[in-house]
Regions:
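Conserved RNA-binding domains used in RNP assembly and mRNA/RNA metabolism
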Residues: 1-143
Length: 143
């Protein structure tokens, strides 16, 4: 059985970005492999250490849509369509991200969030907990 190729954009803690495909990302593992090829069978394979990352963005398209302005606050969307815990993540680099999480826990090494904007190019984001300065949940995430 062939494993699924996930389109990802890897954000390193130092600001470096890598785009490509992975078939072996597992949150509990220390690393995974990223193929930077846009075509199967080409490109470079990188071993990516989770501890070096800010986040892994699982995306709909590698290219994205630079002309689209993503909704970033809970007020901009239909809150009734959200299923999960509201979450606000503040990263060490100053970026603030809001979304929904089903598995956030303070003691975890990382957690997934789903963007609040259904039209976002991001399907889900794995946030590396050590890259954050603050995480707020529930009503606190709306501030």
């Amino acid at each position: 059985m062939q494993s699924q190729r996930n389109k990802v954009v890897v954000h390193y803690s130092d600001g470096t970005l890598l785009k490509g495909y992975t078939h072996d990302f597992v949150p509990d593992k220390e690393s995974f492999h990223l193929n930077t090829a846009l075509e199967p069978g080409t490109g470079t394979i990188h071993e990516v250490e989770i501890s070096d990352l800010k986040a892994v963005f699982f995306v709909k398209t590698i290219e994205g849509n630079s002309s689209y302005t993503e909704k970033r606050t809970f007020e901009e969307i239909d809150a009734k369509a959200l299923h999960g815990i509201k979450i606000k993540v503040e990263f060490k680099d100053g970026e603030i991200m809001r979304g929904i999480s089903l598995g956030y826990g303070k003691a975890k090494r990382g957690f997934f969030i789903v963007p609040i904007d259904p039209r976002s190019n991001n399907e889900r984001i794995y946030v590396v907990a050590s890259s954050t300065t603050k995480v707020a949940v529930g009503a606190e995430a709306e501030k």
